[in-house]
Amino acid sequence: MDNNVYLLRQLPDGPQVLIDAADAPERILELISAGTTPGVSTEKPGLAAVITTHSHWDHVRALAEVLSATGAEHLAGQADAAAMPAPVTVPLENGQQLDFGGLRLEVIGLRGHTPGSIALLYEAPGTPPQLFTGDSLFPGGVGNTENDPQRFGTLIDDVEQRIFDRLPDGTVVHPGHGRETTLGAERPHLAAWRARGW
């Protein structure tokens, strides 16, 4: 299964943050090493944190190895923490603000795909907001809720209220699988998603 992983850094020399250590730990560690600030003496690649968007197996296959190799903190939604294959050092809640040396992320809880699924919002002046949604929002719909109407209702409500009702159409959505999209491209389909129930 193809997954997206995202390595973020506040330029020029801020700490690196990884979103979803999904698979291929050796490749992820190569990317982290390539981004480590030259001249900084460190025994481990420079990674401040791994943020896991949710506890499903396809988003955590490289987690233990990346954490062990880097000594990074592990952040994830509070309600998913017990299901993670590696300890969560910083449990996250909706609305929490994170700051990694100037790289600021807002935690947006999107319950439904899993109880503790989160998205991460990055905003900077002069650029469109960047939203990392894990498996909660994709081009064409919300994440899988296993045909459970209650879980679907919770997820579509969270997606509408916490994302579409407050963020502009230019917001770029970076999902856990597949290509990116924008909120503007997806907004016209919200009613159809709700009507079909997935």
Where are these predicted regions, by residue range?
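Active-site environment of divalent metal-dependent phosphoester hydrolases
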Residues: D2, P25-E26, S55-R61, A81-M84, ...
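Divalent metal-coordination and catalytic microenvironments
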Residues: L8, D20, H54, V66, ...
